[in-house]
Amino acid sequence: MAAKDVKFGRSAREKMLRGVDILADAVKVTLGPKGRNVVIDKSFGAPRITKDGVSVAKEIELEDKFENMGAQMLREVASKTNDTAGDGTTTATVLGQAIVQEGAKAVAAGMNPMDLKRGIDLAVTEVVAELLGKAKKINTSEEVAQVGTISANGEAEIGKMIADAMQKVGNEGVITVEEAKTAETELEVVEGMQFDRGYLSPYFVTNPEKMVADLEDAYILLHEKKLSNLQALLPVLEAVVQTSKPLVIIAEDVEGEALATLVVNKLRGGLKIAAVKAPGFGDRRKAMLEDIAILTGGQVISEDLGIKLETVTLDMLGRAKKVSISKENTTIVDGAGQKAEIDARVSQIKQQIEETSSDYDREKLQERLAKLAGGVAVIRVGGATEVEVKEKKDRVDDALNATRAAVEEGIVAGGGTALLRASAKISAKGINADQEAGINIVRRALQAPARQITTNAGEEASVIVGKILENASETYGYNTANGEFGDLIKAGVVDPVKVVRTALQNAASVAGLLITTEAMIAELPKKDAAPAGMPGGMGGMGGMDF
């Protein structure tokens, strides 16, 4: 076992704080409408330019192992916020850094870290309740567009496009973001369906960078039982190979020998194929397979209907222009089903929704209806160069996630104003001085996002924050984009509550862990062995020419 380096107390926390600061200082310059770009070197191709906090955080790896631990813990704040809310990663990083810095000072002054953490948790719980209480529900397409615009760093075109997409496929509909082949950014709505099952083996992936399997103009085999042996499938597999088209198998499961054989064939390049578990369970699985069959113009291979695998022909398989399979989801785009049959199926599901008395069944039926009737919206992001397209795509992804979050939990005034106002409303009391100090840490940290946004815009943060707090109106704040004070909600400067809430909760959670750290352990760097000396007995070579 390799030797370890162990650091304790203050020296451990100082190293960790250094790592936190390096990561946060790189990420926080991107915050706000006047946030700066970060350029990331890539091992191949052009450098990447981004304003996406989590993309910057993911690139940072420090040489010093103890500093790196601090940086990676803060990176977790950004990643977790991105996973839950899809946006707000930079805000979360700024909050995390502020809480850790203040907390480290308090611990250095001799305060109890556990009581500090309890105080921080008390304050955060109260602020979250305050934010949810102040949230304004969004109903109109204009409000949706405003949220998208803010999250896309003030680009109104992106906000409007996302609002249009949500209007066309519904709030629960599937919206995907792709790189365009042209310089224009455009929206396309395609009939399609997505379900929450991914590929059964990563070897089916066709795009290793994104870890997705994209199969164009594919056949789709729908089977309601498990496949553990491919013998019965050979006739249909051979028929598909003759057409040179890809095949997607959707079955209860594909296991053992069957899965291994498919993977080997895919790797050898003889068969473009992917296997996916069927969505749902029991009777619901049968119904969802039937939905997919109607959407793709295929048949469910079921022994109940007297169809055996050995007798399957190409015309029993479904067809789709594109099937995209990630680790967790499968999207079927532009299935070959007849419109009349799809409409009949939609009517049937609507009828079932009206008749059912179970809320759970109704919810599941509505999900199926959205999948069948909603379609898939595709936003194709264009730009003059590949670097520009990638940077813009990051912003569109953020804007889309923020918009979904806003529809879910509502909005509050943006620009860090909601947190700034909440800091003045904290009334929680600790049971001792150290818990009070923890509450005060959160009070001060809540000002950090607003201060950073104004600093990035080249303004004096203390003056702006002071002026905002002088006005009692909840929605009064500073619009950094045009340099004016006023009602931020009316001006369209808004943040989704879910994003702000998640950023604060994750920042406080990880910061609390960092403050209460008393020891750190890392592997010592390996010492390179001294190179062996030249063997003796090599004399007598002086007469050779070199």
Swiss-Prot record:
Binding locations of ATP: 30-33, 51, 87-91, 415, 495
GO biological process: protein refolding
Keywords: ATP-binding, Chaperone, Cytoplasm, Isomerase, Nucleotide-binding
Catalytic activity entry: ATP + H2O + a folded polypeptide = ADP + phosphate + an unfolded polypeptide
Signal peptide positions on this chain: none
Keyword Transport: no
Gene Ontology MF term list: ATP binding; ATP-dependent protein folding chaperone; isomerase activity; unfolded protein binding
Principal location: cytoplasm
InterPro entries on file: Chaperonin_Cpn60_CS, Cpn60/GroEL, Cpn60/GroEL/TCP-1, GroEL-like_apical_dom_sf, GROEL-like_equatorial_sf, TCP-1-like_intermed_sf
Record EC number: 5.6.1.7
One Pfam family hit: Cpn60_TCP1
Summary of the function given for this chain in its UniProt record: Together with its co-chaperonin GroES, plays an essential role in assisting protein folding. The GroEL-GroES system forms a nano-cage that allows encapsulation of the non-native substrate proteins and provides a physical environment optimized to promote and accelerate protein folding.
HAMAP family listed in its UniProt record: CH60 (MF_00600)
Protein family: Belongs to the chaperonin (HSP60) family.
Protein name in UniProt: Chaperonin GroEL
Source taxonomy: Bacteria, Pseudomonadati, Pseudomonadota, Alphaproteobacteria, Hyphomicrobiales
